């Protein structure tokens, strides 16, 4: 099945024992006879609104691997793989300014805004960089070759063809890409660590594990790794570029608004009064939340962070997005051999103008 509005169809394989599958899934009607594909899909996904399935079947939106259109009378076949378009959730309108930083026949680089997810996930399907770009560029083959957190802005790279995907993804997997981020946070409180980050590059090495269902990552510092015989798997070079006075209580960041955002007054660490620092972060690995977790470990969680040091209610705050931007990306083009240097034009809201 082709994409629809930039969104891929979803595959689902019918289980060998539909009754057991319905029982495990907690269906409202686990013992209902399953004679047709429609019977199973209604019982499994929409027992209280079967019209959703029957309407899809009438529109020819549920098909087999070979493109055969299923109907309400199509018999249930264990092991059959079917394809369908997911029901899209109601999504708030997110920023869609994705200026092109670089493009050739193999790859497209854009400057992602804060709050926009890279790919469909959870509550966001249409409102993602991938979906928006597939529609805008008219290219259903676009695929990101790396990821940025939804809250992070900056340089984001997409492969434009199927052969290019493997080449660029391998480049990232082999750590052949130079990456540099900018962040705003409080100065590191430990005098020795702060002095190291001011005079040169402070290296942070930890072990990071992302547990399914947990919002924050689990992290072990170097002494903990040594005690528990764990291997560090996350390394970041941290440099403080400058220290400056934090804005006053009436400061309003010059940050674009977006429809559907819910603002809360003090996301992440408080930023009024005292001092802030501009950090240059160079990750040598690519673990989930690595930069956010490493600055939190140093006692300087990134301003605007709603996950570290503690999880806050999920809400977008356009006046103070996470103060983290993927600022630079450099690599040797795997096809042309050209040295490609990309730089984000995004500005962090808390930096002095």
Predicted regions and their residues:
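RNA pseudouridine synthases
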Residues: 1-353
């Amino acid at each position: 099945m082709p994409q629809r509005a930039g969104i891929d169809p979803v595959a689902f394989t019918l289980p060998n024992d539909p009754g057991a599958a319905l029982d495990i899934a907690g269906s409202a009607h686990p013992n209902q006879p399953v004679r047709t594909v429609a019977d199973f899909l209604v019982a499994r996904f929409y027992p209280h609104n079967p019209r959703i399935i029957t309407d899809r079947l009438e529109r020819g939106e549920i098909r087999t691997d070979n493109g055969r259109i299923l109907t309400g009378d199509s018999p249930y076949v264990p092991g059959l793989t079917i394809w369908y378009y997911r029901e899209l959730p109601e999504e708030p309108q997110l920023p869609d300014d994705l200026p092109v930083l670089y493009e050739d026949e193999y790859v497209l680089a854009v400057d992602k805004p804060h709050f926009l997810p890279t790919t469909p996930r959870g509550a966001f399907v249409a409102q993602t960089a991938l979906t928006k770009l597939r529609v805008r560029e008219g290219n259903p083959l676009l695929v990101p070759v790396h990821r940025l957190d939804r809250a992070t802005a900056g340089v984001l790279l997409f492969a434009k063809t199927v052969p290019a995907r493997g080449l660029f993804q391998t480049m990232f997997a082999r750590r052949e890409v130079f990456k540099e981020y900018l962040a705003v946070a409080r100065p590191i409180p430990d005098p020795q660590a702060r002095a190291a980050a001011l005079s040169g590059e402070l290296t942070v090495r930890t072990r990071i594990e992302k547990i399914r269902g947990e919002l924050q990552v689990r992290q072990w510092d170097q002494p903990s790794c040594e005690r528990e015989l764990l291997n560090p798997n996350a390394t970041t070079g941290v440099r403080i570029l400058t220290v400056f006075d934090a804005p006053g209580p009436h400061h309003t960041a010059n940050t674009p608004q977006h429809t559907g955002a819910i603002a809360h007054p003090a996301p992440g660490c408080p930023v009024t009064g005292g001092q802030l620092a501009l950090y240059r972060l160079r990750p040598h690995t690519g673990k989930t939340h690595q930069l956010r977790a490493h600055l939190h470990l140093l006692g300087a969680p990134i301003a605007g962070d709603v996950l570290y040091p503690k999880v806050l209610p999920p809400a977008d705050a356009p006046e103070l997005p996470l103060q983290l931007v993927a600022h630079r990306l450099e690599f040797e083009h795997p096809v042309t051999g050209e040295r490609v240097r990309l730089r984000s034009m995004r500005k962090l809201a808390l930096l002095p103008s």
